[in-house]
Design a protein with these regions (language model features):
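Bacterial N-terminal signal peptides that target proteins for export
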Residues: 1-8
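Compact beta-sheet-dominated domain cores in extracellular/mature segments
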Residues: 9-13
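C-terminal motif of bacterial Sec signal peptides marking the signal peptidase cleavage site
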Residues: 15-18
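Cys-dependent protein tyrosine phosphatase-like superfamily
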Residues: 20-253, 267-373
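Ser/Thr-glycine-rich phosphate-binding loops at phosphate-binding pockets of nucleotides
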Residues: 259, 263-264
């Protein structure tokens, strides 16, 4: 009598042998994945360039575009693309934020979008979506935005932002900043929140070094790095409120300061850390600010656009540019110093978030549930 197990194995081997090698390999191959996808926008031509990297070189993808951050109800724009990029121009008169869906053959779709919002009067207004976390999830697009001052947003900008649906705006600026450059939010109903001035101003410490005798650019950069951790502590009440609103599901939410790189950058770094985004990605997001904004031109003017005498930043234009340069940077060293200080004093950045910002484990779970996919 034949052993039934041996007979079964023989049948399986025979069946496999009946298949061609190509068919077997096709059946066993894993579907391609999108390892990375990015979008850039040429504002002059209103042309988007979508680029991607697949897990299998040469894998074909389909592209579609949606007005929803989750990519739902997307409209196909191209199929079976074997290249790694595609350019697309919307029809004339079609405005609003766009999210692109990249779908590999038999694989899972990936949503991507421009990180910097194309606003006429925006300063560093950008989406925190698309970042991968250490546990394999992704920060959802269109839910949290970071920005600089919003006082120059145009009617067209507000029309664009109306489609984003922001429900809460947390303004980290001091009272004098808000009075000088007021935000007049008009992109739909939103809860605009401002905060009492901190007991001390970390920015004052950065500026004082400029007036020291024999000051050098290196001294200014060192002072910037040394004083940077104070931002997290002085802005703790504001950051705590931001986390509370996120935990309550009040999204989409935007937060801003003046430049959009220091107080907003620290807030973004704390939030991304709480979501489980790797440190190197958090630092890279922080460093993007100087890529998107020419801060020297913004705060001191240029030959084509000189700063007005009544500007609150007019005094900066009178200072040596080489000394101002470190203050205008989003140098990775600055936020890394913050992380190192918080780790030395609290054991970890997460301990700071939990103890000083008062974010509970239940709130963290709620925030992650809302903002990750």
């Amino acid at each position: 009598m034949k052993n039934p197990l041996v007979a079964s194995l023989c049948a399986i081997v025979a069946a496999l042998g009946a298949c061609s090698p190509v068919e077997t390999a096709t059946e066993l191959a894993s579907p391609a994945k999108i390892d990375r996808a990015e979008v850039s926008l040429d504002g002059e031509s209103d042309t988007y360039k979508i680029t991607w990297v697949t897990s299998e070189a040469g894998s074909a993808v389909d592209l579609s575009v949606s007005s929803s951050p989750d990519g739902s109800n997307a409209t196909p724009i191209a199929e079976d693309i074997k290249e790694s990029s595609f350019t697309w121009k919307p029809a004339a008169g079609e405005n609003g934020r766009r999210y692109f869906v990249v779908t590999p053959d038999a694989g899972e779709p990936t949503v991507t979008a421009t990180r910097l919002l194309p606003l006429e009067g925006g300063r560093n207004f950008r989406d925190l979506g698309g970042y991968k976390t250490e546990d394999g999830r992704t920060v959802k697009w269109g839910q949290v935005f970071r920005s600089g001052t919003m006082h120059e947003l145009t009617d067209s900008d507000y029309e664009y932002l109306s489609g984003v649906g922001i429900k809460v705006v947390c303004d980290f600026r001091a009272a004098q900043e808000r009075a000088t450059e007021p935000t007049t939010w008009r992109a739909g109903a939103a809860d605009y929140i401002s905060f009492p001035d901190p007991a001390t101003d970390p920015g004052g410490n950065f500026m004082r070094v400029l007036f020291e005798p024999n000051v050098t650019p290196e001294m200014v950069a060192d002072a910037m790095a040394k004083g940077y951790p104070a931002i997290a502590k002085e802005q703790a009440p504001a950051y705590s409120e931001m986390f509370d609103r996120l935990a309550a599901g009040e999204i989409p939410l935007a937060f801003n300061c003046s430049a959009g790189k220091d107080r907003a950058g620290t807030g973004a770094a704390l939030l991304l850390t709480a979501l489980g985004v790797p440190r190197e990605t958090v630092v890279a997001d922080y460093a993007l600010s100087e890529t998107y904004v020419d801060y020297m031109a913004e705060f001191t003017g240029s030959a084509d656009d000189p700063i007005s005498a009544d500007s609150p930043y007019a005094y900066l234009a009178k200072m040596p540019p080489e000394l101002l340069a470190p203050l205008m940077r989003s140098d990775p060293r600055y936020i890394e110093t913050t992380f190192q200080t918080l780790e030395a004093e609290y054991g970890s950045v997460m301990n700071f978030i939990e103890t000083e910002l008062g974010v509970t484990e239940a709130e963290l779970q709620s925030i992650r549930s809302s903002l990750l996919e």
